Structures are given as structure tokens and as C-alpha cells.
A protein has these predicted regions:
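Secretory targeting and sorting signals
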Residues: 1-30
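C-terminal His-loop and adjacent cap/lid subdomain of alpha/beta-hydrolase
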Residues: 29-457
Length: 457
């Protein structure tokens, strides 16, 4: 996980808005200089390796069957019927920054701090940056985020966050090192790709947006708190909440492990923040999310609690990886030594955002329940006096991954179309001063295309 000096959800992987958005202007097209112009100038500052390619289509449609994307790493994040744009020619740059860990085997590199940068020929002058959700890698949000923003004319960049997979907690020396690296790698990539855009297009981006899902949403929050100078705004899709005194994942998930082992009941989950009405999702999350998520993040921040589980690896088979540690049923974050809270404090959020932020969270999220997450973060922002920079939209019927809509189409709705509307709302807020709607719950429509449409107003 070592960075150079001076560099200030396995579970799902195992497991009215237009699609094209606003097209780039004729001026923006002229500025780009033609198909893959200035390719020879593109050099990612600080990269240890890069591979450039001139491609006819940078979207998942055009990249299907190539090694320029990875559908397996996108599994479960979008509903099956999701429509995405295509036909976006331009330059793709894959590579990595210097790092001492090698969890990421993409391209056979076995090297972390991998990134992907996409530079469309028809550029609108903007840049969108994201970090992988869960413990996935750099191509995870290609369908959910990259396709549409590229079609709108934005340059796009994504990082693997510097570590990936369910053994990510082994990265680093001190508790919290692996998660702290996520933030550093996102900052590093943002700074680098702004210079790459200048090489390709002749000037730096006029607007830079940070966004992400789950852990990528956490990164969005952290970046706008700690490096607002790099961004013009962000969209946070169900970002994970880390606070030193709680709530955080380690205060809500132990009850789920206890329940799975018969040591707790439904009322204990309600007390931990899980929503009434989300019970139909609990059996799946018990098998695919709760146990593994608790044990690997507890190992990251509190390795002394049970050194034998998960130990040096979360498991050697899917069954072992997803199995909970029995000791986590009794885990009490509040009773743990102060050193654990200090480890979490290294990556904790404060609510002190410095640029506009829109947060989305499903009311049926059964991994990061909003009552113990985004509801709390919205209050933190208000308490810091930054409420005018924030809008918070609860998505009725939304859950943590849109792929579950395909299993429960009568009880869930995908969040992605609401996210697309939120991104357009953010850019209108930042660039034209259009006031976004006040905080509210986006209700479930009685009819219509819920997979690809979600007006926020």
C-alpha cells in the first residue's frame, strides 16, 4: 500500500431522464482536435505503468469482449433492463501508480493502485472521478456511471482505491491503513487526470465532479470534506459512514451476525437501524453480505479482537469467505479499546463539506441502513453549518444494489435512474445556479419505466 513520498462488495461480485444526457457543444468538439488527437502527449503524472489505446467506443457496449472493461466486476450493481448509451469514441488509458501491494490481478499485473482514464473525442470540458464500490476494482462502475457521463461528454477516471478483494485488510501496517489509502489514491488520481485532460484537450477541466456508490460514496464525502479545492461538487450514492464514536459498520453489523447465529432477534436489527419492511431482503444479506463485511472491516480497524478469524485471509472458497466469525456476534464497538476508535478516526467523516453534495439512499438498504448512515451524515452536515451545500433524497423502495430489483420487481425499484437525475440536478446547481429540490423522499411510481426513469422533482 506504500505511496510515493510527497503524495500528500465481494458479495455482489459473487453474487424523467434521458440516457444520453446533454450532448457536447460544437465548440467542445472542435477543441478535442479529432479522433484520439494528441494521444502521443498523454502521460499520467506519477504512474509507474500506463497503456494507451485509441478506441471506437469507450462504453461497455463497445468494450464487450475486450480487456478494457470487466463485466464480472460490475455484477449485481445494475438492474438487468438498464439501458445505456454507446458510440463514444476516444482514448482509454489503463495503468497503475507505484504501490507495494498486489491484490488487483486485472491485466495480469498483480499490482494495486490501478486506474482507468477515458477521454472522449467529444469533450464537454468536464471530468468525473470515482472510486470502486465495496472491494471491487476500477471497472466496477463502467455501466452504472462511466457509460452515461462519457456520452454526455465528460472525461472519466476510476481507481481501485489501492487495494481490493476481501483480504484488503492485509494491506498496510497500522489498523486503518487500507481504508486511509482509498482516500489518498482518489486524491492522487484526481490531480493526475486533471493534467492528463490538459495534455489531451489543451486545457484543464472547467468542472470536476466526484461521485461513487457505497465505499465510492464514502470517498465522495471524504473528498468534499478534505479536498474541496479539487472538485465542483459530488453525488454520494449510499456512501458508507465512518465516525470514531459511531455509528459505523461496526456498530450496526454485529447484530446481524448475532441474529444469524440465533443470539439476537429482529428487534435487535431494528434497534441497530435496519428498516421495518426490509425483512424480505435479510436472508440474502445474511448469506452474501453481513458476515463477510463485519469480519473484514473489523479486521481492518480492530485486528486484535479475534486474530484467528478472519486471520491472514478471509477464506479460500466462497463459502469460507462469506461465513461470519462466531466471535462477531458479541462484538461491542463501544467497549473496545481507545486504539480502535483512533484507527477509525483516521478515516472518519465530519460533515464539513466544502462543495455542493447530493446524497441518495434507499429506504430498504439492508447492508448500510440509512437510519445509521445517511440520516446521520445529513445531520452532521447541518451541525457543521454546511446544510445549504447539501441535498438528501431518500429513494422509496431502493436497496443497496440494483441487481436485487430483478429478484423482487414488485417490492423494489432501482436507484440508478434516480442517480442519473441527481447528477443532472447537481450540474445544473453548480453550473447554472438552478436550485435543487429540497430534501424529500422520492416515492415509488404507480406505473412507468422504473428501471430507466426517476424524476426527482
Amino acid at each position: 500500500m506504500r505511496l510515493p513520498l510527497g503524495v500528500p462488495f465481494l458479495a455482489a461480485a459473487l453474487t424523467a431522464v434521458t440516457l444520453t444526457g446533454t450532448a457536447p457543444s460544437a465548440t467542445a468538439v472542435a477543441e478535442s482536435g479529432g479522433h484520439c488527437a494528441r494521444l502521443e502527449r498523454v502521460r499520467v503524472p506519477g504512474a509507474a505503468l500506463q497503456r494507451e489505446a485509441c478506441l471506437d467506443d469507450l462504453t461497455t457496449t463497445g468494450l464487450a469482449g475486450t480487456d478494457y472493461t470487466d463485466p464480472a466486476d460490475q455484477a449485481g450493481l445494475t438492474a438487468a433492463g438498464t439501458r445505456t448509451p454507446s458510440g463514444v469514441p476516444g482514448i482509454q488509458v489503463d495503468g497503475y501508480f507505484p504501490d507495494s501491494s498486489g491484490f488487483n490481478t486485472t491485466h495480469g499485473w498483480r499490482h494495486d493502485a490501478q486506474f482507468v482514464i477515458r477521454l472522449p473525442d467529444r469533450w464537454n470540458g468536464g471530468l468525473v472521478v470515482t472510486g470502486a464500490p465495496g472491494n471491487r476494482k476500477q471497472y466496477a462502475t463502467d455501466k452504472a456511471i462511466s457509460d452515461r457521463v462519457l456520452a454526455q461528454g465528460y472525461a472519466y477516471a476510476a481507481t481501485d482505491k489501492g487495494n481490493s478483494g476481501t483480504d484488503f485488510y492485509r494491506d498496510g501496517v497500522r489498523p486503518g491503513d487500507a481504508v486511509a489509502e482509498w482516500n489518498a489514491r482518489t486524491t492522487q488520481l484526481t490531480r493526475a487526470v486533471r493534467r492528463v485532460a490538459a495534455q489531451r484537450y489543451g486545457h484543464a477541466p472547467r468542472r470536476t465532479y466526484i461521485t461513487g456508490i457505497s465505499n465510492g460514496g464514502y470517498l465522495t464525502r471524504w473528498q468534499l470534506e478534505n479536498h474541496p479545492e479539487l472538485y465542483d461538487g459530488g453525488v454520494d450514492w449510499e456512501g458508507a459512514l465512518w465516525t470514531a464514536d459511531g455509528p459505523n459498520l461496526l456498530t450496526s453489523l454485529p447484530a446481524t451476525v448475532a441474529r444469524s447465529l440465533g443470539a439476537a432477534g429482529d428487534e435487535d436489527l431494528y434497534a441497530a437501524g435496519f428498516a421495518r419492511g426490509s425483512e424480505f431482503l435479510w436472508p440474502y444479506h445474511e448469506k452474501a453480505y453481513w458476515g463477510v463485511t463485519q469480519k473484514i472491516y473489523r479486521a481492518e480497524f480492530d485486528p486484535g479482537y479475534d486474530p484467528r478469524c478472519p486471520g491472514p485471509t478471509s477464506g479460500s472458497s466462497p463459502e469460507e469467505i462469506l461465513a461470519p466469525c462466531a466471535s462477531d456476534a458479541a462484538y461491542d464497538y463501544a467497549a473496545r479499546p481507545a486504539s480502535v476508535r483512533r484507527a477509525v478516526a483516521r478515516v472518519a467523516l465530519t460533515g464539513r463539506i466544502g462543495k455542493p453534495l447530493i446524497t441518495l439512499h434507499g429506504d430498504l438498504d439492508a447492508l448500510l441502513p440509512k437510519a445509521a448512515d445517511s440520516d446521520v451524515y445529513a445531520r452532521m452536515i447541518d451541525e457543521r453549518g454546511r446544510g445549504t451545500l447539501h441535498r438528501y433524497y431518500t429513494i422509496a423502495g431502493g436497496t443497496h444494489v440494483d441487481g436485487l430489483y430483478d429478484t423482487h420487481p414488485d417490492r423494489l425499484r432501482p436507484i440508478l435512474p434516480c442517480y442519473r437525475s441527481a447528477f443532472d440536478t447537481l450540474t445544473a446547481w453548480v453550473e447554472r445556479g438552478t436550485p435543487p429540490p429540497a430534501d424529500h423522499t422520492v416515492g415509488e411510481p404507480a406505473d412507468g419505466d422504473v428501471v430507466d426513469s426517476c424524476p426527482l422533482r
